[in-house]
């Protein structure tokens, strides 16, 4: 695979107004993508976004670039990332474009693409788009220019799709659910899905103003949700991130239920109903408690690199259907082609309803190990993890933790940091082991 100049693992992302998140680059990106994609069928591309104010600017620039290449743009407005994957398939579009920076603050944004089947673009297509970005723009003949249209019923279509994944003979009637949409793309979707399935819904984070996305709300900051769940006597709280591809949950006591616990609940229910289709893919950061709990059920488990892209790659490689991260990216491949926060939350709610059990009871089956994370800054170019002294200390710690814990040492890809993670059933032992490794890293 050629080295990427513009595309990262999740499209193009950065600070608005700074390259590459500028209107002129978005125009060129729309044109380059259009030139590559225009060689195929419908010549229509879906464009969705989250609620950031910069989305207006970027969608207009992308649309102009696509039109110059002869492709038409269909705008769906603010919609969750997984909704664009679904709608791209159902509209039989050439591709879907999502304008979002996920859980980042409003001043960041990004652009990523889905293929016609709602999956990440193949590497060779991204590479072809990159190659064109360095070429001068041209424009098709006037009669071949693309058009723009707005799809007004996109939200309703996706709401119905989400509801259709919930068991037909089940209902959320009698449940009180607090839904936190991070002032992001799920603000007009998730509350309606839960209401139409019968739940009493309390909304927070559903008043986006273009600037308040992910601000003290949503999956990355659940304190407000925890407070409302406890004060209102709700059964459960759901927190989505800005683009709706991840989920965190809160039980009736205000306890956080993270991606590892959610993944286990879904896996166990799939096993019970005969729909698991293989094993579960986690990541290097998945808690060892998840691995142990799955082992007790004889469910195969493997770890991918951190990032939902790598989880998806492993799922496809193994032919499995379920994977995710502790950050709340949960992929249920027999429901959607990408991580989907609303679908994942409905899977857990269906398990609660089927067994008449609280989220607290379901999550208790995954006793998460205490996890100690320490970032160590280092000077100079040499990676301390290559030091024999650090390797010796790490090997000694691994020996002591054998069977009851693990360590993960990683060099940051963006900063001069070594990330030290130790987890163990014994929290005090995890802390002392982490400190021992940190001292070795600092000394080398």
UniProtKB/Swiss-Prot annotation:
EC number(s) reported in the record: 5.4.2.10
CDD domains for this protein: GlmM (cd05802)
Gene Ontology molecular-function annotations: magnesium ion binding; phosphoglucosamine mutase activity; phosphomannomutase activity
Enzyme class: isomerase
Post-translational modification: Activated by phosphorylation.
Cofactor binding comment, as recorded: Binds 1 Mg(2+) ion per subunit.
One Pfam family of this chain: PGM_PMM_IV
Active site: 102 (phosphoserine intermediate)
Top-level lineage group: Bacteria
Keyword set, alphabetical order: Isomerase, Magnesium, Metal-binding, Phosphoprotein
GO cellular component, one term: cytosol
Keyword set includes Methyltransferase: no
Gene Ontology annotations of biological process type: carbohydrate metabolic process; peptidoglycan biosynthetic process; UDP-N-acetylglucosamine biosynthetic process
SUPFAM superfamilies: Phosphoglucomutase, C-terminal domain (SSF55957), Phosphoglucomutase, first 3 domains (SSF53738)
Phosphoserine: residues carrying this PTM: 102
Family designation: Belongs to the phosphohexose mutase family.
Function field: Catalyzes the conversion of glucosamine-6-phosphate to glucosamine-1-phosphate.
HAMAP family reported for this sequence: GlmM_B
NCBIfam families: glmM, PRK10887.1
Annotated protein name in UniProt: Phosphoglucosamine mutase
